[in-house]
Amino acid sequence: MSNAIDELQAIIAELKSELEEQKTCTRNARERIERMSAEVVDSNPYSRLMALQRMNIVKDYERIRDKAVAIVGVGGVGSVTADMLTRCGIGKLILFDYDKVELANMNRLFFTPDQAGLSKVEAAARTLSFINPDVRIETHNYNITTVDNFDKFLSTISESGMQQGQPVDLVLSCVDNFEARMAINAACNENNLNWFESGVSENAVSGHIQFIRPGDTACFACAPPLVVAENIDERTLKREGVCAASLPTTMGITAGLLVQNALKYLLNFGEVSDYLGYNALNDFFPKMTLKPNTQCDDRHCLQRQKEFQERPKPVLQQVEEVSDEPLHASNDWGIELVADDAPVAEQAPKATDTANVASGLRLAYEAPEKEAVDQAGHAAAGDGMPETSLEDLMAQMKSM
């Protein structure tokens, strides 16, 4: 009996310690900032982000506060993705995961050993709220692949945007199994939501991101991996004592590529990659675009393809051809204006001029002929004073 009481008292003491720690973190957290500022001061966490406007990269960076992003999977890639978006000042983050933090996760980024035993979404929410209290964080601790939870997931991403009843602006898949990817794919096809799929290989030396626009690009069911196409149970592929390798570097790079393209999509700058891979062995970054499969097994994907085909295509503006003719062929000064890239005909120097020029050199200009110089000199003399010999000039100077 006494042992049980001692154990309970130890648990109570531990809980009190955790509560006090949370209170300390809350007291040390900065106050919320109502409006982003570009003022360059040490106390402004957004000054370097707002500098993107001054450098004409982003037109209005503060729009990021109006965006809601759902992240499914808060593991090696997902937790770093959430961290980056939080530091960027995203308006709202919705986190989905049902796993707990373990010491085996410490080789990856973000989580700390003292968070072992906490649910990943709870541990992430605590840290993210401390990093940036301006971000609204919503957590869901359940497996989205079950029948009941899938309906909850479907409802959440379609109604939990920045405004209640509005869908999220983007869904980011950071899960490590194909079953969850297929669930996200089905939900986004049904809700017609754009989303990014991401992943890291089991040998930890390659990763990828894929931007999926329902109806426009291939969904995850259009060209499924072998493990999905053959209806293989992933759990039968795993043996006790065998696990996938993981490197924080590969996961950090994949998360960086994912967030970079998510920001380009949300803030409308740069080019969003449809598919971008990464191979760490030779630093290779393949890019491609996957077209949708007209025989896809997902009926919602087929419906989105039909809607996309019926959507009016954007009309390309006709660019008028610019004439190469000079704007002013003649003028009072006899100067002809030509384009910068127009060929200039060079007159070949006379043979007498090039006779004494070394090989590889050419004259910068053509010297006038001697007869022309003499004629010009005589003409100038005739217009001015009369001709006087040198002897007469000397005599005049001596007599002065």
Swiss-Prot record:
Instruction: Kindly state which keywords UniProt assigns to this record, in alphabetical order.
Output: ATP-binding, Metal-binding, Nucleotide-binding, Ubl conjugation pathway, Zinc
Q: Which Pfam families match?
A: ThiF (PF00899)
Protein origin, superkingdom: Eukaryota
- Is Metal-binding found in the keyword set? yes
Give one GO biological process term.
Answer: protein ufmylation
| Annotated positions binding Zn(2+) | C219, C222, C296, C301
Sequence positions that bind ATP: G76, D97, K120, N143, N177
Which InterPro entries does the entry mention? Answer: D-isomer_DH_CS1, ThiF/MoeB/HesA, ThiF_NAD_FAD-bd, Ubiquitin-activating_enz
Q: Which residues form the active site?
A: C243
Q: Name one GO cellular component term.
A: cytosol
Reply yes or no: does the keyword ATP-binding apply. Answer: yes
Q: Which GO terms describe its molecular function?
A: ATP binding; metal ion binding; UFM1 activating enzyme activity
- PANTHER family for the chain: UBIQUITIN-ACTIVATING ENZYME E1 (PTHR10953), UBIQUITIN-LIKE MODIFIER-ACTIVATING ENZYME 5 (PTHR10953:SF9)
Q: What does this protein do?
A: E1-like enzyme which activates UFM1.
Task: Tell me what this protein is called.
Answer: Ubiquitin-like modifier-activating enzyme 5
